[in-house]
Curated annotation (Swiss-Prot):
Protein localization: Secreted; Host vacuole, Host pathogen-containing vacuole, Host pathogen-containing vacuole membrane
Top-level taxon of the source organism: Bacteria
Name recorded for this polypeptide: Inclusion membrane protein E
Pfam families in UniProt: IncE
GO CC annotations, alphabetized: extracellular region; host cell membrane; pathogen-containing vacuole membrane
Induction comment: Cotranscribed with incD, incF and incG within 2 hours after internalization.
Organism of origin: Chlamydia trachomatis serovar L2 (strain ATCC VR-902B / DSM 19102 / 434/Bu)
Length: 132
């Protein structure tokens, strides 16, 4: 339980979110500022569209269930894409992601290297294949 409390203290602070946003606004490039603003606007618009879609379905507007389901999936996908794009900008400015990230990159394959050792007259005297 102490581990969970420590994790919450270290990673769930408001400063962990506000500091990267402040960094983007003060030190970020124009492209990063535009991307962050567009992402925030996209998330807000997607949430509004989702709420309107649910309200329309509740009222009983003539909309097929399949079309409504596809619309909700598309809007949720939009929220996820906008949010991940915003997080991408913020991670460049110090936002710490989830502490439980799985390693995405596999270790590089050990490729053999060839080393040439020259002899006295400049010809290849010895060739060694080195694996790491």
């Amino acid at each position: 339980m102490e581990c969970v409390k420590q994790l919450c203290r270290n990673h769930l602070r408001l400063d962990n979110l506000t500091d990267p946003v402040r960094s983007v606004l003060t030190k970020g490039t124009t492209a990063e500022k535009v991307q962050l603003a567009a992402c925030c606007l996209g998330v807000v618009c997607s949430i509004i569209c989702l709420a309107l879609g649910i309200a329309a379905a509740a009222v009983g507007v003539s909309c097929g269930g399949f079309a409504l389901g596809l619309g909700i999936i598309a809007i949720l996908l939009g929220i996820v894409l906008f949010a991940t794009s915003a997080l991408d900008v913020l991670e460049n400015h110090g936002l710490v992601g989830c502490p439980f990230k799985l390693p995405c990159k596999s270790s590089p394959a050990n490729e053999p290297a060839v080393q040439f050792f020259k002899g006295k007259n400049g010809s290849a005297d010895q060739v060694i294949l080195v694996t790491q």
